[in-house]
Amino acid sequence: MKYLPLIIMVIVAYFIGNISPATLIARFYGIDIKKAGSGNAGTTNVLRVLGTKAAICTLLIDVFKGFIAVSIAQGNFNNLGAMLAFAAVVIGHIYPVVFKFKGGKGVATFLGAAMAINWPSMFAAALIAIVVAAISKKMSLGSILAAMMYPLLMLYYYPKAIPIAVFMTFVIIFTHRGNIKRLMKGEEKELSIRSKIKKLRDQLDDAENSEKIETDCSAVSENNNVVEKAAERSETSPEETKPEESSDEVIDATT
C-alpha cells in the first residue's frame, strides 16, 4: 500500500494531460480540430486553422499543465515520482481517454514538464526548436531535433533524469513518425511564423481602425441629433411666440 499515493499521483498527472485546449478552443469556434488542418490537436494545427491568438492560448495551457503535474509530484514525492508524472502527463496529452485517445503530439506539454524537472535544459531545448523551425519553416523538424538533443542536455544539466529524458525522446519521435516520413519525402508543409505574426498585427490594426470608425460615426450621429433638435425648435418657436390678436383689432377688421 505504500505505493498507492504514487499510483494515484500518476493517474492524476495522466488526467491533467487529458485537458486539451486545442480541442476545447476549436469547439468554441465551432470547429472540430481533429477534422481540420492536419487533424492534430496541438498548437501547430491550431495556428494553421484558428490563428495566432488561439495558438498562443493553446501553447500556454499545454505548457502549464505539464509544469503543474510534475511540480505537484516533486513537492510530494522523490525524483522517481517526478519522472513518472513527466511520462504520465505527456502520455495523457497524446492519448487522452476523455477524447477517445486522440490528442496532440505532446511537445508543448513535454516542454512544460521538462521545465519543472530542470528549467535550463528546457529553455535550451525550446531554443533549438525555435531556431530550427524558424530556419526550416517546419515546426515538426524543430520539435524532433529538440527532443533528440534533450537527453544530451539533461546529461549536462541534470544527469539523474537521463532515463526519463531518453524515454520521452522516443515518445516524441514516435508521435512525429508521420512527419518524419513526409520530411524524408520532402512533402512536409511549411509554417511561416512571421506571416502569422504579421496577420495578427494586421488584425489588431483593423480592430483599432474599426473602433475609431465606430467612435467617429457615433460622434457624427450625436451631432446630427443635436442639429435636428435645433431645427425642430426653430420651426416651432414662431408659432409659440406669435402674439394673439386683441378683441379690438378683430372688431376693427370686421367693420
What are these regions (language model features)?
Residues 47-50, 73-77, 88, 92, ...:
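Interfacial segments of multi-pass membrane proteins
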